[in-house]
């Protein structure tokens, strides 16, 4: 039998159910924070942990950012999922606001928010998301203000679309290793390739794109 929950816990559950019914996946920690009126996302994490202990949500202990929401029939308007995300185990993927040389990409101070993605898409990789600025990759289907999903890795193969750090500035381009230099190729005929001989760091490989309609 579940323990009695307080008003804030109920608000979180109601918001989770509302967003799952509307979108098919749970909201981000930041969205929960704003909806319930908390000042800090750490408070949300604390409440989510209490709900997990009460059996109302599930977290995979081997995957710290994985979250599985348990269907709460008392608060849900329907028992039927609206789309394929419902009932799937999800991973809260960090959205990176700033990339800084010499600092780990997933440093807490770099994370602006999180976004839930299906675990079977992310698998066991370490992934993060970035918002694209500019139109240099439009011919590859990556547009201004899109969110790219990036698998963190420090190497790349020719033809991979990567996030690279050059002189403290992140760029999204197609990677090519040439004789004596690296060519970062844009996917827009109006842009020239970037030729790099040193001071280049590969932050990851782009594995997906999300766009707000």
UniProtKB/Swiss-Prot annotation:
InterPro entries: ArsR-like_HTH, LexA, LexA-like, LexA/Signal_pep-like_sf, LexA_DNA-bd_dom, LexA_repressor, Peptidase_S24_LexA, Peptidase_S24_S26A/B/C. GO terms for biological process: DNA repair; DNA replication; negative regulation of DNA-templated transcription; proteolysis; SOS response. Residues 29-49 bind DNA. The keyword Transcription applies. SUPFAM superfamilies: LexA/Signal peptidase, Winged helix' DNA-binding domain. It catalyses: Hydrolysis of Ala-|-Gly bond in repressor LexA. Keywords: Autocatalytic cleavage, DNA damage, DNA repair, DNA replication, DNA-binding, Hydrolase, Repressor, SOS response, Transcription, Transcription regulation. GO terms for molecular function: DNA binding; serine-type endopeptidase activity. Signal peptide: none annotated. Homodimer. Represses a number of genes involved in the response to DNA damage (SOS response), including recA and lexA. In the presence of single-stranded DNA, RecA interacts with LexA causing an autocatalytic cleavage which disrupts the DNA-binding part of LexA, leading to derepression of the SOS regulon and eventually DNA repair. Belongs to the peptidase S24 family. PANTHER family: LEXA REPRESSOR, LEXA REPRESSOR-RELATED. This is LexA repressor. The lineage of its organism: Bacteria, Bacillati, Bacillota, Clostridia, Eubacteriales.
């Amino acid at each position: 039998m579940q323990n009695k929950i307080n008003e804030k816990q109920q608000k979180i559950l109601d918001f989770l159910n509302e967003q799952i019914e509307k979108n098919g996946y749970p909201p981000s920690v930041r969205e929960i924070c704003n909806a319930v009126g908390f000042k800090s996302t750490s408070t949300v994490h604390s409440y989510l942990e209490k709900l997990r202990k009460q059996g109302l949500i599930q977290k995979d202990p081997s995957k710290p950012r994985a979250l599985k929401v348990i269907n709460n029939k008392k608060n849900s308007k329907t028992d039927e999922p609206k789309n394929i995300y419902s009932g799937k185990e999800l991973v809260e993927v960090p959205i990176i606001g700033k990339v800084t040389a010499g600092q780990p990409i997933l440093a807490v101070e770099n994370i602006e928010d999180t976004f839930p993605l299906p675990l079977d898409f992310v698998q066991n990789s370490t992934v993060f998301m970035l918002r694209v600025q500019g139109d240099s990759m439009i011919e590859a289907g990556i547009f201004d203000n899109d969110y790219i999903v990036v698998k963190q890795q420090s190497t790349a193969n020719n033809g991979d679309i990567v996030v690279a750090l050059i002189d403290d500035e992140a760029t999204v381009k197609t990677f090519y290793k040439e004789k004596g230099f690296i060519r970062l190729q844009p996917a827009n005929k109006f842009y020239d390739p970037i030729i790099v001989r040193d001071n280049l760091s590969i932050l990851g490989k782009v594995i997906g794109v999300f766009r707000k309609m």
